[in-house]
Amino acid sequence: MSDEKTQLIEAFYNFDGDYDGFVSVEEFRGIIRDGLPMTEAEITEFFEAADPNNTGFIDYKAFAAMLYSVDES
C-alpha cells in the first residue's frame, strides 16, 4: 500500500470518530473546527459535494474523491 493511501485511510479514521465506516457531518465539522480554518459555509459546501444524496454521511470512497478533487483545484 502506498504511503499516500495509508495517510488517506488514517485521515478518514481520524474523522470517523465512532469507527462505523462513515463520517457524519457532525464528526466532520468537529475535526475541521479543531484543525483547519474553514468557515461554516465552506464546511457545508465541502460536505454537500461529498454527499450528493444528502444522507448526512460520507464513506471512505467519497472522502477520498473529495480530497483528491480539492488537491487538484
Swiss-Prot record:
Gene that encodes the chain: mlcB
Keyword terms: Calcium, Metal-binding, Motor protein, Myosin, Repeat
Pfam families: EF-hand_7
Cellular component terms per the entry's GO annotation: myosin I complex
SMART domains assigned to the protein according to its UniProt record, in alphabetical order: EFh (SM00054)
Complex formation: Myosin I is a dimer of a heavy and a light chain. Inability to self-assemble into filaments. Interacts with myoB. Does not interact with myoC or myoD.
Keyword Glycoprotein applies: no
Molecular function as annotated in GO: calcium ion binding; myosin I binding
Superkingdom to which the source organism belongs: Eukaryota
Domain EF-hand: 3-38, 38-73
Entry function: Functions as the light chain for myosin-B. Binds calcium with submicromolar affinity and may sense physiological calcium changes.
Binding sites annotated in the UniProt record for Ca(2+): D16, D18, D20, E27
Protein name, UniProt field: Myosin-IB light chain
InterPro entries: EF-hand-dom_pair, EF_hand_dom
